[in-house]
Curated annotation (Swiss-Prot):
One example GO MF annotation: chitin binding
Protein name: Antimicrobial peptide 1
Superkingdom field: Eukaryota
Domain Chitin-binding type-1: 26-66, 69-108
Source organism of this protein record: Stellaria media (Common chickweed)
BP term (GO), one: defense response to fungus
Amino acid sequence: MLNMKSFALVMLFATLVGVTIASGPNGQCGPGWGGCRGGLCCSQYGYCGSGPKYCAHNTPLSEIEPTDAGRCSGRGTCSGGRCCSKYGYCGTGPAYCGLGMCQGSCLPDMPNHPAQIQARTEAAQAEAQAEAYNQANEAAQVEAYYQATQAQTQAQPQVEPAVTKAP
């Protein structure tokens, strides 16, 4: 539980790093608390704010609270710089804005949005893993070919050249 001293430290830290905390009882959000107002993100720890610490985590779909006011399906647009998820709800973060998760307004003109950065990072990691797998597979095939060639060479009988004697 967050006591008043801890809450004050969180608010001071948020001010120093340039994020905005929502007004309301302790700025809490998520299941049981509801969403954030004014286009703010709900952090993985359940507090409203802006910036990567609040918007960069992947919100599980079970925690996305559907409300008629937050629906965008059919229109594909959301206010406050939020994305319209493929499930038809407005929000921020990879669950709404990530590659393959967004419809309509997907922040194509905001390449530095935390969700876009995370999506590009995940795509680059997947590509690097695929390349590493392909290189390892190719190396294994070359090694197997080399071993098979060596085995064939050793299995062939050694024939010594015939020596003929002069009469």
